[in-house]
Protein backbone atom coordinates (compact mmCIF):
# COMPACT_ATOMS: atom_id res chain seq x y z
CA UNK A 1 0.00 0.00 0.00
CA UNK A 2 1.53 3.33 -1.07
CA UNK A 3 1.47 6.42 1.12
CA UNK A 4 -0.40 9.51 -0.08
CA UNK A 5 2.84 11.03 -1.38
CA UNK A 6 3.64 8.20 -3.79
CA UNK A 7 0.04 7.65 -4.89
CA UNK A 8 -0.16 11.34 -5.69
CA UNK A 9 3.13 11.42 -7.64
CA UNK A 10 2.11 8.37 -9.72
CA UNK A 11 -1.29 9.84 -10.53
CA UNK A 12 0.30 13.14 -11.48
CA UNK A 13 2.79 11.37 -13.73
CA UNK A 14 0.12 9.42 -15.64
CA UNK A 15 -1.35 12.77 -16.68
CA UNK A 16 1.95 14.56 -17.42
CA UNK A 17 4.30 11.95 -18.86
CA UNK A 18 6.21 14.39 -21.05
CA UNK A 19 6.79 17.12 -18.49
CA UNK A 20 9.34 17.98 -15.84
CA UNK A 21 7.28 17.59 -12.70
CA UNK A 22 7.95 19.57 -9.57
CA UNK A 23 5.55 19.05 -6.68
CA UNK A 24 5.40 19.13 -2.93
CA UNK A 25 3.10 16.35 -1.68
CA UNK A 26 3.75 17.58 1.87
CA UNK A 27 2.31 21.01 1.00
CA UNK A 28 -0.88 19.34 -0.23
CA UNK A 29 -1.00 17.03 2.75
CA UNK A 30 -0.78 19.94 5.19
CA UNK A 31 -3.40 22.08 3.44
CA UNK A 32 -5.84 19.14 3.18
CA UNK A 33 -5.23 18.25 6.83
CA UNK A 34 -6.05 21.81 7.86
CA UNK A 35 -9.10 21.81 5.58
CA UNK A 36 -10.42 18.51 6.96
CA UNK A 37 -11.09 20.30 10.28
CA UNK A 38 -13.78 22.29 8.47
CA UNK A 39 -15.56 19.21 7.16
CA UNK A 40 -17.98 16.54 8.37
CA UNK A 41 -19.47 13.26 7.16
CA UNK A 42 -18.39 11.75 3.85
CA UNK A 43 -16.45 14.90 2.92
CA UNK A 44 -14.20 14.43 5.94
CA UNK A 45 -14.03 10.66 5.57
CA UNK A 46 -12.75 10.85 1.97
CA UNK A 47 -10.20 13.53 2.81
CA UNK A 48 -8.75 11.67 5.78
CA UNK A 49 -8.74 8.35 3.92
CA UNK A 50 -6.85 9.93 1.02
CA UNK A 51 -4.16 11.06 3.48
CA UNK A 52 -4.07 7.49 4.87
CA UNK A 53 -5.34 8.37 8.35
CA UNK A 54 -8.24 6.96 10.35
CA UNK A 55 -9.36 9.90 12.47
CA UNK A 56 -9.25 13.69 12.44
CA UNK A 57 -7.06 13.70 15.57
CA UNK A 58 -4.52 11.43 13.88
CA UNK A 59 -4.56 13.73 10.83
CA UNK A 60 -3.86 16.83 12.93
CA UNK A 61 -1.20 15.11 15.05
CA UNK A 62 0.67 13.93 11.97
CA UNK A 63 0.52 17.29 10.20
CA UNK A 64 1.87 18.88 13.36
CA UNK A 65 4.62 16.27 13.61
CA UNK A 66 5.65 16.74 9.95
CA UNK A 67 5.90 20.52 10.40
CA UNK A 68 7.91 20.31 13.63
CA UNK A 69 10.26 17.69 12.18
CA UNK A 70 10.94 19.73 9.03
CA UNK A 71 11.34 23.04 10.82
CA UNK A 72 13.63 21.89 13.61
CA UNK A 73 16.83 23.03 11.87
CA UNK A 74 15.51 26.36 10.70
CA UNK A 75 16.43 25.30 7.15
CA UNK A 76 12.84 24.65 6.09
CA UNK A 77 10.22 27.29 6.82
CA UNK A 78 6.54 26.38 6.73
CA UNK A 79 3.65 28.82 6.91
CA UNK A 80 -0.11 28.30 6.88
CA UNK A 81 -2.75 30.95 6.32
CA UNK A 82 -6.51 31.31 6.61
CA UNK A 83 -7.87 34.33 4.73
CA UNK A 84 -11.59 34.70 5.25
CA UNK A 85 -14.62 36.91 4.54
CA UNK A 86 -16.83 35.01 6.98
CA UNK A 87 -16.55 34.35 10.67
CA UNK A 88 -15.63 30.67 10.84
CA UNK A 89 -16.61 28.20 13.51
CA UNK A 90 -14.55 28.81 16.69
CA UNK A 91 -13.25 25.23 16.83
CA UNK A 92 -11.89 25.46 13.27
CA UNK A 93 -10.07 28.70 14.11
CA UNK A 94 -8.62 27.16 17.28
CA UNK A 95 -7.30 24.13 15.37
CA UNK A 96 -5.85 26.40 12.69
CA UNK A 97 -4.03 28.48 15.27
CA UNK A 98 -2.85 25.70 17.59
CA UNK A 99 -2.07 22.71 15.39
CA UNK A 100 -1.13 24.57 12.22
CA UNK A 101 0.23 27.87 13.59
CA UNK A 102 -1.94 29.56 10.97
CA UNK A 103 -1.92 33.25 10.31
CA UNK A 104 -5.60 34.37 10.16
CA UNK A 105 -6.62 37.48 8.27
CA UNK A 106 -9.39 39.06 6.23
CA UNK A 107 -9.78 37.94 2.62
CA UNK A 108 -9.97 41.15 0.60
CA UNK A 109 -9.10 40.20 -2.98
CA UNK A 110 -6.70 38.09 -5.02
CA UNK A 111 -3.88 40.58 -4.38
CA UNK A 112 -3.81 39.82 -0.69
CA UNK A 113 -3.59 36.09 -1.48
CA UNK A 114 -0.64 36.72 -3.81
CA UNK A 115 1.06 39.03 -1.33
CA UNK A 116 0.86 36.34 1.38
CA UNK A 117 2.45 33.80 -1.00
CA UNK A 118 5.15 36.22 -2.12
CA UNK A 119 6.09 37.07 1.48
CA UNK A 120 6.30 33.44 2.57
CA UNK A 121 8.38 32.30 -0.42
CA UNK A 122 10.95 35.12 -0.21
CA UNK A 123 9.60 36.62 -3.42
CA UNK A 124 10.30 33.49 -5.47
CA UNK A 125 6.61 32.84 -6.18
CA UNK A 126 5.15 36.21 -7.01
CA UNK A 127 1.57 35.16 -7.61
CA UNK A 128 -0.55 32.06 -7.41
CA UNK A 129 -3.87 33.37 -8.79
CA UNK A 130 -4.97 35.93 -11.40
CA UNK A 131 -8.49 36.38 -10.14
CA UNK A 132 -10.80 35.39 -7.33
CA UNK A 133 -14.53 34.76 -7.66
CA UNK A 134 -16.61 37.00 -5.36
CA UNK A 135 -18.27 33.78 -4.13
CA UNK A 136 -15.01 32.54 -2.58
CA UNK A 137 -15.52 32.96 1.17
CA UNK A 138 -12.23 31.57 2.43
CA UNK A 139 -8.77 30.76 1.12
CA UNK A 140 -6.47 28.31 2.89
CA UNK A 141 -2.77 28.69 2.15
CA UNK A 142 0.42 26.74 2.72
CA UNK A 143 3.96 27.75 1.86
CA UNK A 144 7.20 25.83 2.24
CA UNK A 145 10.59 27.47 1.74
CA UNK A 146 13.96 25.71 1.70
CA UNK A 147 17.48 26.95 1.10
CA UNK A 148 20.73 25.12 1.86
CA UNK A 149 24.30 24.72 0.64
CA UNK A 150 25.80 21.41 -0.44
CA UNK A 151 28.24 19.83 1.97
CA UNK A 152 30.47 19.16 -1.07
CA UNK A 153 30.03 22.08 -3.40
CA UNK A 154 30.54 21.79 -7.14
CA UNK A 155 33.43 23.75 -8.63
CA UNK A 156 31.95 26.35 -10.97
CA UNK A 157 34.96 25.85 -13.29
CA UNK A 158 33.92 22.23 -13.76
CA UNK A 159 30.43 23.05 -15.00
CA UNK A 160 30.31 22.11 -18.67
CA UNK A 161 27.81 22.42 -21.47
CA UNK A 162 27.06 18.84 -22.46
CA UNK A 163 24.48 16.89 -24.42
CA UNK A 164 21.54 15.75 -22.35
CA UNK A 165 18.90 13.26 -23.45
CA UNK A 166 15.31 14.37 -22.98
CA UNK A 167 12.52 11.92 -22.23
CA UNK A 168 11.57 11.75 -25.93
CA UNK A 169 15.22 10.87 -26.76
CA UNK A 170 15.84 14.28 -28.32
CA UNK A 171 19.12 15.88 -27.26
CA UNK A 172 19.81 19.34 -25.97
CA UNK A 173 22.81 21.13 -24.57
CA UNK A 174 22.54 21.76 -20.85
CA UNK A 175 24.85 22.94 -18.09
CA UNK A 176 26.11 19.91 -16.20
CA UNK A 177 27.86 20.33 -12.86
CA UNK A 178 30.59 17.82 -12.14
CA UNK A 179 32.09 16.16 -9.06
CA UNK A 180 35.12 14.01 -9.92
CA UNK A 181 35.91 10.91 -7.85
CA UNK A 182 34.07 12.19 -4.79
CA UNK A 183 33.16 9.77 -2.03
CA UNK A 184 29.37 9.72 -2.06
CA UNK A 185 26.63 7.40 -0.85
CA UNK A 186 25.76 5.41 -3.97
CA UNK A 187 23.43 2.47 -4.56
CA UNK A 188 22.32 0.51 -7.59
CA UNK A 189 20.13 -2.50 -8.32
CA UNK A 190 18.89 -4.10 -11.56
CA UNK A 191 16.57 -1.21 -12.38
CA UNK A 192 18.07 1.96 -11.00
CA UNK A 193 21.04 3.96 -9.77
CA UNK A 194 20.74 6.33 -6.81
CA UNK A 195 23.06 8.84 -5.18
CA UNK A 196 22.65 10.88 -2.01
CA UNK A 197 23.90 14.45 -1.78
CA UNK A 198 24.23 15.94 1.69
CA UNK A 199 23.46 19.52 2.55
CA UNK A 200 25.61 21.41 5.00
CA UNK A 201 23.22 20.81 7.89
CA UNK A 202 24.45 19.74 11.31
CA UNK A 203 22.41 16.58 11.81
CA UNK A 204 22.20 15.63 8.10
CA UNK A 205 18.42 15.40 8.44
CA UNK A 206 17.74 16.71 4.93
CA UNK A 207 19.39 15.36 1.79
CA UNK A 208 18.83 15.32 -1.93
CA UNK A 209 18.46 11.91 -3.54
CA UNK A 210 18.85 11.58 -7.30
CA UNK A 211 17.47 8.40 -8.87
CA UNK A 212 18.12 7.32 -12.46
CA UNK A 213 16.78 4.36 -14.41
CA UNK A 214 19.53 1.84 -15.22
CA UNK A 215 18.50 1.40 -18.83
CA UNK A 216 19.34 4.35 -21.04
CA UNK A 217 17.86 2.74 -24.14
CA UNK A 218 14.15 3.34 -23.73
CA UNK A 219 14.33 6.46 -21.65
CA UNK A 220 10.66 7.40 -21.60
CA UNK A 221 9.59 3.86 -20.74
CA UNK A 222 12.34 3.52 -18.11
CA UNK A 223 11.48 6.76 -16.33
CA UNK A 224 7.75 6.07 -16.34
CA UNK A 225 8.36 2.50 -15.12
CA UNK A 226 10.58 3.81 -12.36
CA UNK A 227 7.86 6.21 -11.15
CA UNK A 228 5.17 3.54 -11.57
CA UNK A 229 7.11 1.13 -9.32
CA UNK A 230 8.07 3.69 -6.71
CA UNK A 231 6.31 3.04 -3.42
CA UNK A 232 7.15 3.26 0.27
CA UNK A 233 8.97 -0.08 0.35
CA UNK A 234 11.16 0.59 -2.66
CA UNK A 235 11.93 4.15 -1.56
CA UNK A 236 12.79 3.15 2.02
CA UNK A 237 14.92 0.35 0.62
CA UNK A 238 16.85 2.86 -1.51
CA UNK A 239 17.26 5.24 1.44
CA UNK A 240 18.32 2.43 3.78
CA UNK A 241 20.97 1.27 1.31
CA UNK A 242 22.20 4.83 0.74
CA UNK A 243 22.56 5.36 4.49
CA UNK A 244 24.86 2.36 4.95
CA UNK A 245 28.55 3.07 5.55
CA UNK A 246 29.28 0.47 2.88
CA UNK A 247 27.47 2.55 0.23
CA UNK A 248 30.25 5.16 0.21
CA UNK A 249 31.80 4.91 -3.25
CA UNK A 250 34.05 7.07 -5.38
CA UNK A 251 31.67 8.54 -7.92
CA UNK A 252 32.00 10.77 -10.96
CA UNK A 253 28.77 12.70 -10.76
CA UNK A 254 27.22 14.87 -13.45
CA UNK A 255 24.22 16.81 -12.20
CA UNK A 256 22.20 19.24 -14.34
CA UNK A 257 22.22 22.82 -13.14
CA UNK A 258 18.64 23.94 -13.47
CA UNK A 259 15.93 26.35 -12.49
CA UNK A 260 12.37 25.14 -12.84
CA UNK A 261 8.87 26.18 -11.96
CA UNK A 262 5.68 24.21 -12.24
CA UNK A 263 2.07 24.93 -11.43
CA UNK A 264 -0.90 22.65 -11.33
CA UNK A 265 -4.61 22.57 -10.57
CA UNK A 266 -5.12 19.53 -8.34
CA UNK A 267 -8.92 19.16 -8.57
CA UNK A 268 -8.98 16.26 -11.04
CA UNK A 269 -6.10 14.32 -9.51
CA UNK A 270 -7.61 14.48 -6.02
CA UNK A 271 -11.02 13.40 -7.35
CA UNK A 272 -9.39 10.45 -9.13
CA UNK A 273 -7.69 9.49 -5.87
CA UNK A 274 -11.08 9.30 -4.15
CA UNK A 275 -11.66 12.79 -2.76
CA UNK A 276 -14.67 13.96 -4.76
CA UNK A 277 -17.35 14.97 -2.25
CA UNK A 278 -15.51 18.14 -1.15
CA UNK A 279 -15.81 19.54 -4.70
CA UNK A 280 -19.54 18.86 -4.99
CA UNK A 281 -22.25 21.41 -4.29
CA UNK A 282 -23.55 19.38 -1.35
CA UNK A 283 -20.15 19.09 0.36
CA UNK A 284 -20.27 19.09 4.16
CA UNK A 285 -18.34 22.08 5.45
CA UNK A 286 -20.33 22.56 8.66
CA UNK A 287 -17.01 22.60 10.51
CA UNK A 288 -16.44 26.06 9.01
CA UNK A 289 -20.02 27.32 8.99
CA UNK A 290 -23.26 25.67 10.04
CA UNK A 291 -25.30 28.25 8.08
CA UNK A 292 -23.56 28.52 4.70
CA UNK A 293 -23.43 25.92 1.92
CA UNK A 294 -19.72 25.69 1.10
CA UNK A 295 -17.59 23.54 -1.21
CA UNK A 296 -14.05 23.54 -2.63
CA UNK A 297 -13.76 25.60 -5.80
CA UNK A 298 -10.15 24.67 -6.56
CA UNK A 299 -6.82 23.60 -5.15
CA UNK A 300 -3.68 24.92 -6.81
CA UNK A 301 0.00 24.41 -6.23
CA UNK A 302 2.92 26.39 -7.60
CA UNK A 303 6.54 25.31 -7.12
CA UNK A 304 10.01 26.68 -7.78
CA UNK A 305 13.48 25.13 -7.55
CA UNK A 306 16.99 26.32 -8.32
CA UNK A 307 19.81 23.76 -8.20
CA UNK A 308 23.31 25.15 -8.73
CA UNK A 309 26.96 24.65 -7.72
CA UNK A 310 26.42 26.10 -4.26
CA UNK A 311 23.21 24.34 -3.24
CA UNK A 312 19.45 24.34 -3.60
CA UNK A 313 16.71 26.91 -3.18
CA UNK A 314 13.17 25.58 -3.42
CA UNK A 315 9.69 26.65 -2.46
CA UNK A 316 6.10 25.61 -2.81
CA UNK A 317 2.79 27.42 -2.38
CA UNK A 318 -0.61 25.72 -2.19
CA UNK A 319 -3.96 27.49 -2.34
CA UNK A 320 -7.39 26.03 -1.54
CA UNK A 321 -10.53 28.08 -2.27
CA UNK A 322 -13.73 27.49 -0.33
CA UNK A 323 -16.73 28.81 -2.21
CA UNK A 324 -20.32 29.67 -1.40
CA UNK A 325 -22.98 27.69 -3.23
CA UNK A 326 -24.90 30.45 -5.05
CA UNK A 327 -28.41 29.78 -6.26
Predicted regions located by residue number:
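Secretory/exported precursors with cleavable N-terminal leaders
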Residues: 1-327
Amino acid sequence: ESSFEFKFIKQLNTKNKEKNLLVSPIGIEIILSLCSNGTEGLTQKEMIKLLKYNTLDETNDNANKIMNELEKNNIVKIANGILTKIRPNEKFVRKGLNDYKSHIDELKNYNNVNKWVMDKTNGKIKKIIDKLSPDVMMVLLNAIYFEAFWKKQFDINHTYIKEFYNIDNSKENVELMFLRGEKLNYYENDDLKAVKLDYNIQDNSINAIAILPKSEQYLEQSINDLIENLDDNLFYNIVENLNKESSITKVNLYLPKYELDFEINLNEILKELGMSKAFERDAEFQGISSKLKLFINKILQKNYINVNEKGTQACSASELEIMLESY
